């Protein structure tokens, strides 16, 4: 048993999987084994040595580490838990962490059988709630349909880009550059100055460093990812790019300007994508040539954590452009919605 504070804030609401050594360090497992056979041997030995084993809470005089909500020490810090949880979630209305906290606080004030009923009640609320249904639909049924190509127009072969131009190295552009490089694409990260573009690349460097530290990637893989991102302030470096993803300020004039400059040097059939979240795709495309190649590609922030991309089709977006965007590596692994915007409408409408 870890105690309420440690269990809730450091384990239960984190939603993370732990490597065996870390799990042992935290205290959520008791022993490690190198092989399955060794694990069985240790389990048999423990059972033989403890024929009358009981759960910790069944032992005479057992007390929860750190106390219960009624103990003065825990009671003095318990009111801060909801605020800390909200800060951790960045205000997102996620019901599971809330129910976990409620279960821990309520169940530690009653007998164990009542505690199990409290846990079952909160779990049932989550499993049958609308949020669970929405996530099941989006991440299972919708994702299966997307990966099966049901959202891709008929008559178009699968396509994958080789070199990506990301216009704008701010928070969104930096994140987009990272996920594109993670997908294996060569990325040219363009901003108004080389300093700004290099600053955008440091975002990827930070993510790689965290990944290596946490064992989610290797140093070699991280370095290879970073080598795929080239920061620049020169439009000429976009030569050879077969997809453009714009992530500059929300200004129709500015967005059209950077597209015009990029279109002078990228591949003549390059897919033109805007990450806008507020401006109508049809209006943005209206000031450009090749409106059929123009499409909305709205990533959600933070890009490296949000498994969602919204594809927005303009009035003149061609089936070929939609098919390209629907078959790219990042698109195929990310659930997203597809819609059409009319002149004067918003992608969010």
Whereabouts are the PLM-identified features?
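NAD(P)+-binding Rossmann beta1-loop-alpha1 motif at the extreme N-terminus of oxidoreductases
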Residues: 147-210, 230, 314
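Rossmann-like NAD(P)-binding element
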Residues: 31, 80-82, 195-196, 210-272, ...
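Rossmann-fold dinucleotide-binding core
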Residues: 1-7, 17-25, 274-348
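Generic beta-strand/beta-sheet core signal
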Residues: 26, 167-169, 175, 190-193, ...
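Rossmann-like dinucleotide-binding cores of NAD(P)H-dependent redox enzymes
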Residues: 186-224, 309-322, 344-348
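Amphipathic alpha-helical segments at domain termini/boundaries
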Residues: 6-122, 139-155, 223-246, 324-334, ...
